[in-house]
Curated annotation (Swiss-Prot):
Gene from which the chain derives: TBP2
Function: General transcription factor (GTF) that functions at the core of the DNA-binding multiprotein factor TFIID. Binding of TFIID to the TATA box is the initial transcriptional step of the pre-initiation complex (PIC), playing a role in the activation of eukaryotic genes transcribed by RNA polymerase II. Interacts with TFIIB1 and is required for activated transcription and possibly basal transcription. May act as GTF of RNA polymerase I-dependent transcription and rRNA synthesis. Forms a ternary complex with PBRP1 and the rDNA promoter region.
PROSITE patterns reported for this sequence: TFIID (PS00351)
Protein name per the record: TATA-box-binding protein 2
Assembly, per entry: Belongs to the TFIID complex together with the TBP-associated factors (TAFs). Binds DNA as monomer. Interacts with TAF1 (via N-terminus). Interacts with TFIIB1. Interacts with PTF2. Interacts with HAT5/ATHB-1 and ATHB-7. Component of a nuclear protein complex containing at least TATA binding proteins (TBPs, e.g. TBP1 and TBP2) and ATX1.
UniProt-annotated location(s): Nucleus
Parts forming coiled coils: none
Origin superkingdom: Eukaryota
Example GO molecular function: DNA binding
Sequence repeats: 25-101, 115-192
Species: Arabidopsis thaliana (Mouse-ear cress)
Similarity comment: Belongs to the TBP family.
Amino acid sequence: MADQGTEGSQPVDLTKHPSGIVPTLQNIVSTVNLDCKLDLKAIALQARNAEYNPKRFAAVIMRIREPKTTALIFASGKMVCTGAKSEHLSKLAARKYARIVQKLGFPAKFKDFKIQNIVGSCDVKFPIRLEGLAYSHSAFSSYEPELFPGLIYRMKLPKIVLLIFVSGKIVITGAKMREETYTAFENIYPVLREFRKVQQ
């Protein structure tokens, strides 16, 4: 896929990524308004990749293979698309779902497409002293290892949540634009280095 950005074999642009690490986008959540009322039962009966169990959840769950995604389609015409690995693929998938709904006889449009959340991840390749980090950044951190093994770091600017694991694996969530994911990681990277665990 051409849209995967800087991941892979190309050299990293150090002006944008001084750490030399580019977080990989793992999941994009987007929404769009099909702008018409939908008969979910009819959609579930006619579309072969759809399931609908109104007692469990008030939406049709539909999946496509390319781009590998899942859509939640509501009777109001609102749709949520998850699972794409880039913004471009998320929009492409959402358009495919809209087209499926159109082919089933609904006057579906494609209004107000919006990226709602970008989840990225990376590995700094060194272990991190989470206790020390949590203590010195207590205003932004919550770390309760008996409940969850990662430290939850709530960055203010950009407004992003990072899950930081002792292994050096990082999950970055809450961005609406990939640049926020990258900025958040570059902001936290010096802190991670400061709390690098020294191997005995």
